[in-house]
Amino acid sequence: LDMAWYTRDKAFDGDVREYEREAWKRTQLLPPVKETCMTVQFGHIMSGGYSAGYYSYKCAEVLDADAFSVFKKKGIFNQDVAQSFRDNILSKGGTEHPMTLYKRFRGQEPTIHALLKRNGIK
């Protein structure tokens, strides 16, 4: 929804709820609650300088779930996995591009699959 608003190239002069319904048609999983107007209710993504920053939490959740899936697969207390995580993620800080470090630990780029599974979606 926020991207629908942020990528408009013309000023909006219409019914906000109707605009939301149109913007959500491709992605909404559940029917909207009558009289709900997310644009004015979800301040995290709709106002102030925080709006784009909200997505950093979602990116962090993807990385968290994906990395933890390695531990779950190979054993939560697997020393080799723990050492690789320490050597390739924790000890490197900003010395290399984060994706380079993550792929060195994980062997691939992160995917959303582990997060979807953890959240009971898949």
In which residue ranges do the predicted regions lie?
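C-terminal, non-catalytic "cap/extension" segments appended to globular domains
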Residues: 2-122
